[in-house]
Amino acid sequence: MLFDIFRAVILGVVEGVTEFLPVSSTGHLLLVGRFFNLGEDSFWKSFAVLIQLGAILAILSIYFAKLWRIALGMFSDPAARRFVIGVLVAFLPAAMIGAVAGSYIKLYLFNPWVVCFSLIVGGAILLWVDQLDLNPQQHDATAFPLPMYFYIGCAQCLAMIPGVSRSGASIVAAMLFGADKRSAAEFSFFLAIPTMVGAFVYDFYKNRGEMTTDHLTIVAIGFVVSFITAVIVVKTFLGYVTRHGFELFAWWRVIVGTLGLIALAMGR
């Protein structure tokens, strides 16, 4: 039990740190899970999804005032209503593909080799886009054009491949379609809410009968750790990318992916 608590804390930290950075939380959790020899254990696979609720609540707590204002104005304020529609438009492509092909993606693509290659390729793309002279025209994540929300949602579908990164795909797409770095990152936070809530509800419902009291305790620990870590990371991340961009995270992806491939080639 103590070792399970230790693993829950480590995985909670990994989830909280990586969920909103463009480095792929799923990819990092798969690699850390391999280090802990979690293998095909169905509980730990579900654990990785369930502790995302902590990260979701971190976003809700940080942006509570803004989201509450949007919710209250949804029926009276055209701008608020338009943003809600935009988030739904961005969410739907991934929701539809996940419903149709989610089980096949997990079966065939959830392995460390795919993660490492995706980390490297995604890192190279992020580095390239970060260094482009894009002359951004969109500076408010709640006021993008509706077609732009849809394009970002389509790009997010690529993140179903482990190692691509949900936030990374949406940030790159947002920047290519005219968003500045801060608003691109901020919209990736907002888009995470329906995407991650959907994954959480689906996984919890599917595995509700298999959860023991010990399992719930472990999940609760991971949840609290991921919440605290995510709050710290999100508050730091926006200021950092506004000043320095995404180069650090791009190189992090390339280095982790390369080291992972070396370890896999050595049979680790």
From Swiss-Prot:
Keyword NADP recorded: no
GO terms of molecular function: undecaprenyl-diphosphatase activity
Enzyme Commission code: 3.6.1.27
GO biological process: cell wall organization; peptidoglycan biosynthetic process; regulation of cell shape; response to antibiotic
Listed HAMAP family: Undec_diphosphatase
Matching NCBIfam families: PRK00281.1-2, PRK00281.1-4, undec_PP_bacA
GO cellular component, one term: plasma membrane
Protein name as annotated: Undecaprenyl-diphosphatase
Family: Belongs to the UppP family.
This protein's UniProt keywords: Antibiotic resistance, Cell inner membrane, Cell membrane, Cell shape, Cell wall biogenesis/degradation, Hydrolase, Membrane, Peptidoglycan synthesis, Transmembrane, Transmembrane helix
Keyword tRNA processing appears in the UniProt entry: no
